[in-house]
């Protein structure tokens, strides 16, 4: 079973049955440094890079104007994210019917919840494609935090913690039926909302 920062702090009993598709023996839960320094504040369609900047950007709620799933739900296998709601920016929404790599700027926010009846997210997972070539996940930025535990993941796809907690699973998005829980899933993105 995959042990990760989400499973440690958000309802691990529900997580047990949902992680078989994305296994990793690395149980790291530490945070990498503030990736990229966080100097870019982002904009309404692009999250910034760096934990402090992403935290402030999420608090602004600007992503709630994106293409969001209508309700909180149990995560789709093989996700380890327990209970969530995904919001995709226009880059993903406008290219969801495609089959090639996502354009630069593709981004999503996954609100993480402790239960399907919770009304406030207990954490967030954010990803952003930073270059045209995904380079096996190296050119994707990932951020993950839990309200109770602070930032757990913050860095590019080759960062050791990011690789064990995010990239190792997201690499399989769209690769086969088990890793395509939503139409259009591919190139690091499992659930393109449009």
Features from the language model and the residues they span:
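Sec-dependent bacterial lipoprotein signal peptides
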Residues: 1-20
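Compositionally biased, intrinsically disordered/low-complexity regions enriched for serine, proline
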Residues: 9, 44-45, 189
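Amphipathic alpha-helical interaction segments
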Residues: 13, 65, 74, 148-151
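Ser/Thr-rich, Pro/Gly/Ala-heavy low-complexity intrinsically disordered linkers and tails
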Residues: 18-45
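Sequence contexts marking disulfide-bonded cysteines in secreted/extracellular proteins
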Residues: 21-23, 67-69, 86-88, 167-170
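Sequence context surrounding c-type heme c attachment/ligation sites in exported
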Residues: 23-28, 32, 51, 56, ...
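N-terminal secretory signal peptides
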Residues: 46-99
């Amino acid at each position: 079973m995959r042990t990760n920062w989400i499973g440690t702090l958000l309802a691990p009993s529900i997580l047990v049955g949902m992680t078989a598709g994305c296994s990793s023996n690395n149980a790291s839960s530490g945070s990498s440094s503030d990736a990229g320094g966080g100097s870019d504040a982002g904009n309404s369609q692009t999250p910034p890079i760096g934990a402090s900047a992403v935290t402030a950007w999420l608090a602004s709620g600007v992503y709630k104007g994106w293409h969001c799933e209508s309700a909180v739900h149990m995560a789709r296998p093989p996700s380890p994210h327990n209970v969530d709601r995904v919001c995709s920016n226009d880059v993903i929404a406008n290219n969801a019917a495609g089959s090639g790599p996502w354009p630069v700027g593709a981004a999503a926010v996954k609100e993480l919840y402790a239960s399907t009846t919770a009304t406030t997210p207990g954490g967030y997972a954010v990803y952003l494609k930073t270059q045209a070539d995904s380079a096996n996940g190296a050119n994707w930025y990932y951020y993950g935090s839990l309200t109770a535990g602070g930032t757990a993941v913050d860095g590019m796809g080759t960062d050791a913690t990011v690789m064990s907690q995010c990239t190792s699973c997201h690499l399989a998005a769209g690769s086969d039926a088990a890793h395509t829980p939503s139409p259009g899933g591919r190139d690091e993105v499992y659930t393109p909302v449009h």
